Amino acid sequence: MKPPFLLALVVCSVVSTNLKMVSKRNSVDGCIDWSVDLKTYMALAGEPVRVKCALFYSYIRTNYSTAQSTGLRLMWYKNKGDLEEPIIFSEVRMSKEEDSIWFHSAEAQDSGFYTCVLRNSTYCMKVSMSLTVAENESGLCYNSRIRYLEKSEVTKRKEISCPDMDDFKKSDQEPDVVWYKECKPKMWRSIIIQKGNALLIQEVQEEDGGNYTCELKYEGKLVRRTTELKVTALLTDKPPKPLFPMENQPSVIDVQLGKPLNIPCKAFFGFSGESGPMIYWMKGEKFIEELAGHIREGEIRLLKEHLGEKEVELALIFDSVVEADLANYTCHVENRNGRKHASVLLRKKDLIYKIELAGGLGAIFLLLVLLVVIYKCYNIELMLFYRQHFGADETNDDNKEYDAYLSYTKVDQDTLDCDNPEEEQFALEVLPDVLEKHYGYKLFIPERDLIPSGTYMEDLTRYVEQSRRLIIVLTPDYILRRGWSIFELESRLHNMLVSGEIKVILIECTELKGKVNCQEVESLKRSIKLLSLIKWKGSKSSKLNSKFWKHLVYEMPIKKKEMLPRCHVLDSAEQGLFGELQPIPSIAMTSTSATLVSSQADLPEFHPSDSMQIRHCCRGYKHEIPATTLPVPSLGNHHTYCNLPLTLLNGQLPLNNTLKDTQEFHRNSSLLPLSSKELSFTSDIW
């Protein structure tokens, strides 16, 4: 009988020892330790704060006075690592008052844990409190780390109290509290009422969320406490809703074996308090964790959130799909109100689908490439076709007379060697001929159409303003003589180019590098706002279906094609150097019924055998001609000209000719035939 009794005694001893160890698990050196209290104290630097010993408010049923009367002493320590150091109160910045520590002006270094110990020779109990002191954030009246948090459902009633106000009350009066929202005074709505030290919102709206700061004065210092109010939707009474896959509508996904796969499950969760969304995948009755290692769940992703309502996603990930993975997978979503689920069926993809997809995408890609190539090669032709059939006439109601103003250089063949006669003929003959005769445009050519009515500059400015385009034929001679100077000297013309009031078409007749100062050309291009550059390539551009003429017509105004009568442009005997293109003379033509007494033999400078038979004339001006100078005899079909060189319109005198008396020059040559030298004895820029 003794062995069983001894065994029972040993067991009782062990149990008793274990019970004693459990009862002393939270005690150190015989002192009961309640660890850290849930309440945290927070203050801004420079503000007063009171840290109260939590033993008298949450752990023992007695107050400080009663405990002191029974011989218990209250001592304070500050935790520094694993050590607790006694606090020496300076009475200046920090003092002890009954069951509390008063920080009269808290500093950031005061942050930490403070332990109050209540003990005598036979009894000991302690607890720690947390204090956080922080500086204001830049531009704010609070620090986001030391805000209090309150929540309220939308449309509900909410009261926001000013924390720790009891610590700053005086026995005879309530503290005067001022409320701010986002650190600014606010005109509260009628349903928001300040009730004592609290702010009462009778019906919370979404816009009521934010930071509320209460402010009061204590011992000459400001005390601020900030509370963040989070507004949420009404507490839901419904289970979550699957968004993909859809509930009661299984989705079928065709997969290719050996390829990775990612299947998302999306669901909507109404606001259900502090509980987070619960979402997971299953294969039949097994959780994903129970399946093979190549199948796993991803992380829960928050897609959207509004007032606590969330849309989340959980992906089912296959590193490489195998035959055994072709099955039904279910996504489950839960909250405290219930559970919903939706399914996905994996099915093997036939190879024909891939071939069809590749063929379709390839055909679309080839079609896009073909369209791009066609556009790159025929973009101008396409635009001209569109303009011809659908474009509006640009010349309607714009109050402009001419389609383009032609600016070029006429070179004196006797005084300047011309390296490019083909370019000269193009600028003076071919270009106007084709634009007027073939395409029906109306050009203003100064040498032909200028009718003096004022000063030369005013006349040119007026005609440029009446033109829809400005065509500049850019030859080396044009650049050497700075043919564009007229557009820089006249302010109105310069403003038209700079502001884009008129579009400029710049035609380059040759490669300019190495022949002229290209910096001036580039400066000219930069000064023009609306500029199109077209290059004339000689014989390559001679045919009407060449890229040059199509590009030029594209840059010209949109208008219906109007063919001008040939008699207005060319003589029947005139032929050009370009075969298909017919030239017009460098000086516009006209004829007169008046004839001179002198015969052809009397005109030593008249050369009927020239390679190009060009009828020369100049515009008639208001010049009184005596009737006696027109005799009856006729010279036949010869043309007559006023001997008034067009260069004199600028007030210039012919080069290499010195006139002693300009008036005598005009008086003695009022009506004489002009020789070819007189017609080209200088370089005129128009």
Curated annotation (Swiss-Prot):
Highest rank taxon of the organism: Eukaryota
User: Locate the Ig-like C2-type domain: which residues?
Assistant: 18-132, 141-232, 239-347
Ranges in the Extracellular compartment?
17-354
Q: Ranges in the Cytoplasmic compartment?
A: 376-686
Classification via InterPro entries: Ig-like_dom (IPR007110), Ig-like_dom_sf (IPR036179), Ig-like_fold (IPR013783), Ig_I-set (IPR013098), Ig_sub (IPR003599), IL-1_rcpt_fam (IPR015621), IL-1_rcpt_II-typ (IPR004077), TIR_dom (IPR000157)
Entries under SUPFAM superfamilies matching the protein: Immunoglobulin, Toll/Interleukin receptor TIR domain
For whether the record's keyword set contains NAD, the answer is: yes
Q: Name one GO molecular function term.
A: interleukin-1 receptor activity
**UniProt-annotated glycosylation sites, renumbered to this chain:** N63, N120, N136, N211, N328
- For this entry, the protein name equals X-linked interleukin-1 receptor accessory protein-like 2
Keyword set includes Transmembrane helix: yes
Q: Which residues, if any, are the signal sequence? A: 1-16
Q: What is known of its domains?
A: The TIR domain mediates NAD(+) hydrolase (NADase) activity. Self-association of TIR domains is required for NADase activity.
Disulfide pairs?
A: C53-C116, C162-C214, C265-C331
Identify the tissues in which this protein is expressed: Detected at low levels in fetal and adult brain, in particular in the frontal lobe, temporal lobe and cerebellum. Detected at very low levels in skin, liver, fetal ovary and in placenta.
User: What phylogenetic lineage does the species belong to?
Assistant: Eukaryota, Metazoa, Chordata, Craniata, Vertebrata
Question: Which UniProt keywords are given for this protein, alphabetically ordered?
Answer: Disulfide bond, Glycoprotein, Hydrolase, Immunoglobulin domain, Membrane, NAD, Receptor, Repeat, Signal, Transmembrane, Transmembrane helix
- Assigned GO CC terms: cell surface; glutamatergic synapse; plasma membrane
Localization (cell): Membrane
- Domain TIR intervals: 400-556
Predominant location: membrane
Catalytic site residues?
Answer: E488
PROSITE patterns associated with the record: IG_LIKE, TIR
